[in-house]
């Protein structure tokens, strides 16, 4: 079953279905850039709002999504990790707001590892709690190009075929019991409670799997079970991952697949962001693992 048929079968609201289909269509455009810029993997000489050097493909993917959405007028608000402000689309046909990490893991491209795109959809402006999100999706560009999405009616995975259509691969994904851990940050910088939690996971036989691509690592957790973490750490106690562009969309997908999301204390999706660049400590994965880190944090 192709994506269009699936959205129709699920009874997805017409305008939302149109937007999801449109966004999925940008996967091919993003992947085209992999070939056209494959010999230029250095920095562009510009930085995003977080002070990170932008790579040519960061800017290329950002341009693909922004220009396509502006031309389509399917959304009113666009916020991306590469921009320092929310873009308001003139003459928008809908009130949707989208948050986008155009190319997660772009530093891995020069060694030909998986990268991805992360997108969250709101009914209106994007400076809202993550629980207000009405849909979330990611596209994983690896040996296969995969689309995983939720509209709060299960989590579903599609694979892109030769024609460009996305075809159903897995319906109603649920996180299984598993023992994979994907921990970000340097061990020497861990805060006490996080370090204790990591030791517990290691003692219980959790295997370390961390690629440097948030999308790829969470995708593996969805299929094999376990937990992804990028904590607050020495020098960055507030965390590193972006609440709007990364944490909220991926948190929605994981929670809809039967998992949980937390900043170590509570579900970060209940936080109203004060700025588009807000960051958060992040733990997502199985409910058991998330309950354990929250317990470690409470105990200090």
Swiss-Prot record:
Gene Ontology molecular function, alphabetical: fructose 1,6-bisphosphate 1-phosphatase activity; magnesium ion binding
GO biological process: fructose 1,6-bisphosphate metabolic process; fructose 6-phosphate metabolic process; fructose metabolic process; gluconeogenesis; sucrose biosynthetic process
Primary site of residence: cytoplasm
Residues that hold substrate according to the record: 104-107, 240
Binding site for Mg(2+) 1: 81, 101, 103
Subunit structure: Homotetramer.
Annotated protein name in UniProt: Fructose-1,6-bisphosphatase class 1
Organism: Methanoregula boonei (strain DSM 21154 / JCM 14090 / 6A8)
């Amino acid at each position: 079953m192709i994506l269009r048929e699936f959205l129709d079968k699920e009874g997805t609201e017409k305008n939302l279905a149109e937007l999801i289909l449109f966004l999925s269509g940008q996967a091919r455009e993003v992947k085209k850039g992999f070939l056209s810029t494959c010999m230029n993997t250095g920095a562009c000489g510009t930085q995003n709002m977080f002070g990170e050097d932008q790579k040519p493909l960061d800017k290329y993917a950002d341009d693909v999504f922004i220009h396509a959405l502006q031309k389509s007028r399917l959304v009113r608000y666009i916020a991306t990790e590469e921009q320092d402000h929310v873009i308001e689309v003139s003459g928008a046909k809908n009130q949707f707001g989208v948050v986008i990490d155009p190319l997660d893991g772009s530093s891995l491209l020069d060694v030909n590892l998986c990268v991805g795109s992360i997108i969250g959809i709101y009914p209106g402006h994007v400076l809202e709690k993550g629980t207000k999100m009405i849909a979330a999706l990611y596209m994983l560009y690896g040996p296969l190009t995969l689309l995983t999405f939720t509209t709060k009616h299960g989590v579903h995975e599609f694979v892109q075929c030769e024609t460009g259509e996305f075809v159903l691969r897995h319906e109603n994904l649920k996180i299984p019991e598993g023992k994979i851990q994907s921990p970000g940050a340097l061990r020497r910088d861990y805060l006490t409670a996080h370090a204790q939690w990591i030791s517990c996971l290691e003692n219980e036989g959790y295997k370390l799997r961390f690629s440097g691509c948030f999308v790829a690592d969470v995708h593996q957790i969805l299929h094999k079970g376990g937990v992804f973490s990028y904590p607050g750490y020495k020098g960055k106690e507030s965390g590193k991952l972006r609440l709007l562009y990364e944490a909220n969309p991926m948190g929605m997908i994981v929670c809809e697949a039967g998992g949980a999301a937390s900043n170590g204390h509570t579900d970060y999706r209940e936080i109203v962001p004060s700025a588009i660049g807000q960051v958060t400590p992040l733990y997502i994965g199985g409910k058991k693992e998330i309950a354990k880190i929250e317990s470690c944090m409470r105990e200090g």
